[in-house]
Amino acid sequence: MEGAAVSAAGDGPAVETGLPGSPLEAVAGATAAPVEPRKPHGVKRHHHKHNLKHRYELQETLGKGTYGKVKRATERFSGRVVAIKSIRKDKIKDELDMVHIRREIEIMSSLNHPHIISIYEVFENKDKIVIIMEYASKGELYDYISERRRLSERETRHFFRQIVSAVHYCHKNGVVHRDLKLENILLDDNCNIKIADFGLSNLYQKDKFLQTFCGSPLYASPEIVNGRPYRGPEVDSWALGVLLYTLIYGTMPFDGFDHKNLIRQISSGEYREPTQPSDARGLIRWMLMVNPDRRATIEDIANHWWVNWGYKSSVCDCDALPDSESPLLARIIDWHHRSTGLQAEAEAKMKGLAKPGASEVVLERQRSLKKSKKENDFPQSGQDSVPESPSKLSSKRPKGILKKRSNSEHRSHSTGFIEGIVSPALPSPFKMEQDLCRTAIPLPSSPEADMSGKLSLKQSATMPKKGILKKTQQRESGYYSSPERSESSELLDSNDVVISGGLSSPPPDPARGTSHSLSCRRKGILKHSSRYSDGGTDPALTRPEMPTLESLSPPGVPSDGISRSYSRPSSIISDDSVLSSDSFDLLELQENRPARQRIRSCVSAENFLQLQDFETPHNRPRPQYLKRLADSSFSLLTDMDDVTQVYKKALEICSKLN
């Protein structure tokens, strides 16, 4: 299945389509970059009656949509397994939807890449459009992650390299996908990536701006949700950042329970990094930059050291960065950026603590992978309002993709899906129609809400269940194009819109208390989630403190005279806890213990140039932390003779980048 597409045998002339000279190019203009000659991708076009059942044996249904369904089938003569997508024309009520369906066929027929679903044949008559396409037997990448909960770094890099390779090929040929998500990424027999669903894709030019605010909310970039014009590739780069975060951590970076919180998180690039760090966190932060000019391009991603770690060659054949250093030096630079970012984040938190009412704004902690919505499932504003003058229309900012839909409106297409390129004299099917989408989305206006959203991560009374929650229900397949409406769009009709799909965690129960109220928990030194937690500090960043002498009384003889079963239930004490009765002889209870520095201060960036100060016994780390220090990111430097020179070189590169 992988490799160049094979044209199927059949009646009728074969029409070879490609980006150079294709009908789509004649309509939408030239591509963004010169297209290199490549092997022609033959696609049969049939415009006459043809009985498919004579050539294909239809099997089970893979997915359903508004306009038809996708079935698995086997070609009788060759035995090749294909996916057959049938579209009923009588269900297409809007001409623009037909334009986008034909555009998807043109673009997918023009692309020829081993990690993009191929189209073999297209049949069309007055009633139907039937597309014979490549079949990916392993299904969606979403389901693959759902079964495994979390992928290894090696497997994640394998998948991400193939995704980046396909997206780079699209951008090089002037095509932007605009709907990259786990549901639109399929797997073949050999677990190789196959990108599908080009229903929202379009050609772009570097000197033009697009104004179609489409895509899935959980993967949408800040310029999409805020209704700002964009060039195109930067939208795919943002979606790649969300995909990489999800592949590594198994959760979504932006996971607000309502559309206002989601817009605020995306607009500020506000996401939580799990306590278990990954070497790809620097690349994720680069791809999730709010400013599109500072965001990583597809060439930056393809040449990043993490993407190419363990491989002899880069993902793409594009030019690498000049004077690129070794991956080791890149990791030092990446660590430096992370350290400065954490310091700035801590300062922002301290400033937010001083503001009144800061604890009232809660940022829901994302802990689960959610099924994303199709673009036309977003709530939309009514279009039957009173017409406004052109001056008022031009003064309004265009709307984003997260809009409220009135209950009386049930159109199958999205006004946010209408395509427009900011350039004059375009043919009518591709002209700008942004006049239909002018309602701006209200953004949170309180600065306290933006600055203190992270203050109550630990104060939420109820947290969503960690992991990937999947509901077994019939839904659309990744083969289906985005203009088609899914079954769960009615969930977005209320005022408090829930962006998450059927796999989302339930919202917090109001009966259990507000999110900023502290949960009832017995005081004392109790182990929580295999780490010591004080309720307000990240457990991974906190060193366990020495217990008081009062807390070291034998469990069987409590000081207050109450039996152990009432004073401290055994269910809240971990078997491997340091405070268990079998481990009291391991505690160090010297009264005049000299104060020791924390690990972070011992190996901080500022003291790297004065390593000789750490040779005294007073400043050496405690023995139980030696293994943790050896396993940290600084262990990469232990095999080098001159640590100071490497760090100085990294600082010079960081200063040049800044």
Swiss-Prot record:
Its EC number is 2.7.11.1. Expressed in the developing central nervous system, in epidermis, and some other tissues. A motif (GILK motif) lies at residues 400-403. Residues 378-393 have a biased composition (Polar residues). Its cofactor is Mg(2+). Disruption phenotype: Lethal during development, no live-born. At 18.5 dpc, homozygous mutants suffer from omphalocele with a failure in closure of the secondary body wall leading to organs outside of the abdomen. Omphalocele are apparent at 14.5 dpc when the physiological hernia is almost rectified in wild-type embryos. Residues 56-307 form the Protein kinase domain. It is an enzyme of class 2 (transferase). The modification Phosphothreonine is found at T212. Gene3D superfamilies: Transferase(Phosphotransferase) domain 1. Residues 40-53, 394-405, 519-530 have a biased composition (Basic residues). InterPro entries: Kinase-like_dom_sf, Prot_kinase_dom, Protein_kinase_ATP_BS, Ser/Thr_kinase_AS. Activated by phosphorylation on Thr-212. Activated by phosphorylation at Ser-601 AKT1 during glucose starvation; the relevance of such activation in normal cells is however unsure. The active site is at D179. ATP binds at L62, G63, K64, G65, T66, Y67, G68, K69, V70, K85. GO terms for cellular component: cytoplasm; fibrillar center; microtubule cytoskeleton; nucleoplasm; nucleus. One of its GO terms (molecular function) is p53 binding. Serine/threonine-protein kinase involved in various processes such as cell adhesion, regulation of cell ploidy and senescence, cell proliferation and tumor progression. Phosphorylates ATM, CASP6, LATS1, PPP1R12A and p53/TP53. Acts as a regulator of cellular senescence and cellular ploidy by mediating phosphorylation of 'Ser-464' of LATS1, thereby controlling its stability. Controls cell adhesion by regulating activity of the myosin protein phosphatase 1 (PP1) complex. Interacts (via GILK motif) with PPP1CB; the interaction is direct and bridges NUAK1 and PPP1R12A. Interacts with CDKN1A. This is NUAK family SNF1-like kinase 1. The lineage of its organism: Eukaryota, Metazoa, Chordata, Craniata, Vertebrata. The gene is Nuak1.
